[in-house]
Amino acid sequence: MKAILLVSHGSRIAKTKKEAKKLRDILKKRSRVSIFEYAFLEIESPGIPEGIDICVQKGASEIVVLLNFFTSGRHVDLDIPRIVEEARQKYPKVKFKITKPVGRHPGMVDLFLEMIK
């Protein structure tokens, strides 16, 4: 069973967690994926390892790590892949995929142009 784990950075600002949860809720409803969780790289909980554990406990055999990050950087290029690799070792029967940062999506140009109208 496919699961999506929406991964955000995390922040000490309380509204950040609410925004991530709201985004997850909207995506879950529109995607119709039954296992759709969220996690944070740091500061907030659940952390990425806990989010992966939750997905596996709910029956995931495949987890798509959906990056709520705009560009590449240390977290996207090093930290998150390292955490996912640790999860691969822990759950060898689970398939993992990490998406590209949102900013690499070709639709971002149109979105930005719409925002500045």
Provide a role label for each language-model segment.
Residues M1-K117:
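Active-site-proximal alpha-helix that buttresses catalytic centers in soluble enzyme cores
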